[in-house]
Amino acid sequence: MINSPRVCVQVQSMYIETQSQPESDRYVFAYTITLRNLGRHPVQLIGRYWLITNANGQETEVQGEGVVGEKPRILPGGEFQYTSGAVLETPLGTMQGHYDMVDDQGQGFHVAIPVFRLAIPSLIN
């Protein structure tokens, strides 16, 4: 049995008011992801899958290679952080998904991205 390498995912999201246009149903959010390699071997992020859901239940799937134009290799005890964005038609939504990773032996595995909320500050009490 192959033990999957341990990778921790931490997410922070924020509303970008200066780029949003609520009167046109355009709400812009940024999210910062930190990936930490808690295992004993290097791992590499090679792809991503996102499920983005707005407050009306409309779902959008996004998948592709790497993140922000990179396929980072993360050493044991190391981390990789990046910031990206999402545009919703509602002031509230969620994102979730997974990263496609490989270890040094070429063994592929998924790392889950937990559900996180995208919300304008006035909706968070």
UniProtKB/Swiss-Prot annotation:
SUPFAM superfamilies recorded: ApaG-like
Annotated signal peptide: none
PROSITE patterns reported in the protein's UniProt record: APAG
Alphabetical GO biological process terms: error-free translesion synthesis
Domain (ApaG) ranges: 1-125
Coiled-coil segments: none
PANTHER family according to UniProt: F-BOX ONLY PROTEIN 3, POLYMERASE DELTA-INTERACTING PROTEIN 2
NCBIfam families the record matches: PRK05461.1
Listed name of the protein: Protein ApaG
UniProt gene name: apaG
